[in-house]
Amino acid sequence: MDTEMMPKFSSKDEEIDYWKCLSLKYKKSCHDAQEELQEFQEGSRELEAELEAQLGQAEHRIRDLQSENQRLKSEVDILKEKLEQQYAQSYKQISMLEDDLLQTRGIKEQLHKYVRELEQANDDLERAKRATITSLEDFEQRLNQAIERNAFLESELDEKESLLVSVQRLKDEARDLRQELAVRERTSDVTRMSAPSSPTLDIDKTDSAVQASLSLPATPVGKTMEHPFIGTKALTNGCGNGSPLTPSARISALNIVGDLLRKVGALESKLAACRNFAKDQAARKNYTTGNGNLINSNATKFSHSLHTTYFDKTTMNGLDPGALSAAIASPRAVSPPGLLPLSV
């Protein structure tokens, strides 16, 4: 190839010059290559030393990193163990908290049920309280009415006692009047036989008419035992005041006796109504016994105080409580003897 590229020389000197120039050229390039090689070798040695230093540093760093990695691995293992322990503890704690939560929910539901039951019981108690208060107010109202009625009946009984005393007195006066009329009839018969045309004939006729109008029965045994000591002067004089009664006074006295007897009959009807009221009170008492222990206790206390007050009042009024209760409790279909009305 070189031979092909070799130029053709015309002379040997020209060829020698050519080859000299070429050898100088190659020698110079060889010298340059050697210098470059030497520089390259020096650079490579420096680079090798630098790389070896870097390699040592890298190996030292690798060893440090490996030790650090080993330490971190051990720490990771420790942390894993701690995490597992913490997870186990957390799981146990969560399980316990869930159990406590379930128990708390159950207790909460029970408390809600208990609260509802208490509210229902409270509503029932409030309704019972309102019913008890209503029944108690009704009972107090009826009891106050009964107290007022009993007070009215006490006054009526006091009036009846006074009227009975007045009636008994008037009966005694009427009996005395009948006896006086009988005596006057006998005296009038004697005077009529002695003096037929006496001016006192009209008065005797009036006395006989009054005696015929009197139809009172005899005084009952019980009442005569109450007044066993009647003076003889009262029997002879009528009223016991020392002066004989005129016919008009006798007729007015008989009218008063008739009015009093009618009042006594009205009082007997009121007494029968009082007995019926006592029966109604007994029935109401039996009814109120089923309204509960509270009403029963209050009613017992109130009725006890009423009973004490009632009989204290009767004692203060001069009445016998036993006789009064017996008179109210014992039913009498007919009037007692000696209380028949007068026919005037």
Swiss-Prot record:
Alphabetically sorted, this entry's keywords are: Coiled coil, Cytoplasm, Cytoskeleton, Microtubule, Phosphoprotein, Transport
- Judging by the UniProt lineage, the source's domain of life is Eukaryota
| Listed GO MF terms | microtubule binding
Concerning Gene3D superfamilies, the annotation shows: 6.10.250.1080
Q: Which residues form a coiled coil?
A: 26-189
Q: InterPro entries, alphabetically?
A: NUDE (IPR033494), NUDE_dom (IPR006964)
Q: Which cellular component terms (GO) are annotated to the entry?
A: centrosome; cytoplasm; kinesin complex; kinetochore; microtubule; spindle
Post-translational changes noted in the entry: Phosphorylated in mitosis.
Where can this protein be found?
Answer: Cytoplasm, Cytoskeleton; Cytoplasm, Cytoskeleton, Microtubule organizing center, Centrosome; Cytoplasm, Cytoskeleton, Spindle
Question: What main location does UniProt list?
Answer: cytoplasm
Q: Name one GO biological process term.
A: mitotic centrosome separation
Family per record: Belongs to the nudE family.
Q: What does this protein do?
A: Required for organization of the cellular microtubule array and microtubule anchoring at the centrosome. Positively regulates the activity of the minus-end directed microtubule motor protein dynein. May enhance dynein-mediated microtubule sliding by targeting dynein to the microtubule plus end.
> Per its UniProt record, what PANTHER family does this chain match?
NUCLEAR DISTRIBUTION PROTEIN NUDE HOMOLOG 1, NUCLEAR DISTRIBUTION PROTEIN NUDE-LIKE 1
Give the protein name, as stated in the record: Nuclear distribution protein nudE-like 1-B
